[in-house]
């Protein structure tokens, strides 16, 4: 007599998707980090959109807009902390995901690995833009440290820094 989960038409679909999943027998919890990355990314996008609704572009009122979000917006303090800690969690999951790929030898699949490296560089560039270039609330320290890494590139480094900032160093909020 066959098991009902293997013979019933609807239960057979669920069984093949969840119970008898066609996955390697040595799969571990390390393989969850791709899904966790997606969850963290959705959290960042949603909280970022809600925070942007109460955002002030002027440098003189930037601190007041943060105070407004934390005090006057319903659960604004939670949005702010979820956004800040979600970014940290995103990068922790990202590095663990890459570490899992290194540990299990995923770099041997050249095309897949190259797509992953390209995605990693894209994430880093996006994080740079989100951390350094918000309207009126630029982090001077972050901008200086990150762009001074560009100045270490031989021959073109100083030219790159001057091109990005319009001068030798960061001066004011760039986008207001």
UniProtKB/Swiss-Prot annotation:
Name of the protein: Cytochrome b
Cofactor binding comment, as recorded: Binds 2 heme b groups non-covalently.
Membrane topology recorded in Swiss-Prot or TrEMBL: Multi-pass membrane protein
Family, as annotated: Belongs to the cytochrome b family.
Cofactor: heme b
Binding site for heme b b562: 83
Transmembrane domains' residue ranges: 33-53, 77-98, 113-133
Gene that specifies this protein: MT-CYB
Organism field: Idionycteris phyllotis
Domain of life: Eukaryota
CDD domains for the chain: Cytochrome_b_N
Assembly, per entry: The cytochrome bc1 complex contains 11 subunits: 3 respiratory subunits (MT-CYB, CYC1 and UQCRFS1), 2 core proteins (UQCRC1 and UQCRC2) and 6 low-molecular weight proteins (UQCRH/QCR6, UQCRB/QCR7, UQCRQ/QCR8, UQCR10/QCR9, UQCR11/QCR10 and a cleavage product of UQCRFS1). This cytochrome bc1 complex then forms a dimer.
GO CC aspect terms: mitochondrial inner membrane
């Amino acid at each position: 007599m066959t098991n009902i989960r293997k013979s019933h038409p609807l239960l057979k679909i669920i069984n093949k998707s969840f119970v008898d999943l066609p996955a390697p027998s040595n799969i571990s919890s390390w393989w969850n980090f791709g899904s966790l990355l997606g969850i963290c990314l959705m959290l960042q996008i949603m909280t970022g959109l809600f925070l942007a609704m109460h955002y002030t572009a002027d440098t003189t009122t930037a601190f007041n807009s943060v105070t407004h979000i934390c005090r006057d917006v319903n659960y604004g303090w939670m949005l702010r902390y979820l956004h800040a800690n979600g970014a940290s969690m995103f990068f922790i999951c990202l590095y663990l995901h890459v570490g899992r790929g290194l540990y299990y030898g995923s770099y041997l699949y050249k095309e897949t690995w190259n797509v992953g490296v390209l995605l990693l560089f894209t994430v880093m560039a996006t994080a740079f833009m989100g951390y350094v270039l918000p309207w009126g609330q630029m982090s001077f320290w972050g901008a200086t440290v990150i762009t001074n890494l560009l100045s270490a590139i031989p021959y073109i480094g100083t030219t790159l820094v001057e091109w990005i900032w319009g001068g030798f160093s960061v001066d004011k909020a760039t986008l207001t």
